């Protein structure tokens, strides 16, 4: 044990970067705004139920875009609705994130071919950070997507664009079984 180690242990000094502190604060207080449009909204509501307890991840749902930093688009986005989605997105403060939940918001879903009124993916009007596939995706998949957003926030650095951070995140693999295993353990303890 050196002189520096003794000084740190005696005076409770914390050594970290500003990036780590800012990212920890942002990922520990993620405030999503749900934009439930179809079947996926039911699964999104189930995810907010007490048996999944999103608050343990620091996720507190908000109903105002001015208080949220994550928009969850869950369901079919029509052409008439596109302008409203853009307006809500622009009202969100920076840094803001978008999670696209379900086949309809990802690529148009079953309406992509013959639905002239359906937008063929919400990413055509606003930038999407994380996609959650499924029709509708289970709550565990949505929790996995929320954890991906938190991982994206954790990897952000001052001076590095979000596109570079997304590229790094895509290089990592994500196992949705981890969420299921964690849930089973927490239910066994209860």
Swiss-Prot record:
Keyword 4Fe-4S included in the entry's annotation: yes
Membrane topology: Peripheral membrane protein
One cellular component term from this protein's GO annotations in UniProt: respiratory chain complex I
Catalytic activity as recorded in UniProt: a quinone + NADH + 5 H(+)(in) = a quinol + NAD(+) + 4 H(+)(out)
BP GO annotations: aerobic respiration; electron transport coupled proton transport
Binding site for [4Fe-4S] cluster: 39-40, 104, 135
Enzyme class: translocase
InterPro entries: NADH_UbQ_OxRdtase-like_20kDa, NADH_UQ_OxRdtase_20Kd_su
UniProt keyword annotation of S-adenosyl-L-methionine present: no
EC numbers on record: 7.1.1.-
Main location: membrane
Names of required cofactors: [4Fe-4S] cluster
Keyword vocabulary terms for this entry: 4Fe-4S, Cell inner membrane, Cell membrane, Iron, Iron-sulfur, Membrane, Metal-binding, NAD, Quinone, Translocase, Transport
Gene3D superfamilies: 3.40.50.12280
Cofactor binding description: Binds 1 [4Fe-4S] cluster.
Location in or out of the cell: Cell inner membrane
Molecular function terms, GO-annotated: 4 iron, 4 sulfur cluster binding; iron ion binding; NADH dehydrogenase (ubiquinone) activity; NADH:ubiquinone reductase (non-electrogenic) activity; quinone binding
Family to which this protein belongs: Belongs to the complex I 20 kDa subunit family.
Job of this protein: NDH-1 shuttles electrons from NADH, via FMN and iron-sulfur (Fe-S) centers, to quinones in the respiratory chain. The immediate electron acceptor for the enzyme in this species is believed to be a menaquinone. Couples the redox reaction to proton translocation (for every two electrons transferred, four hydrogen ions are translocated across the cytoplasmic membrane), and thus conserves the redox energy in a proton gradient.
HAMAP family named in the record: NDH1_NuoB
Assembly notes: NDH-1 is composed of 14 different subunits. Subunits NuoB, C, D, E, F, and G constitute the peripheral sector of the complex.
Cited PANTHER family: NADH DEHYDROGENASE, NADH-QUINONE OXIDOREDUCTASE SUBUNIT B 2
Protein name in the entry: NADH-quinone oxidoreductase subunit B
Organism expressing this protein natively: Prosthecochloris aestuarii (strain DSM 271 / SK 413)
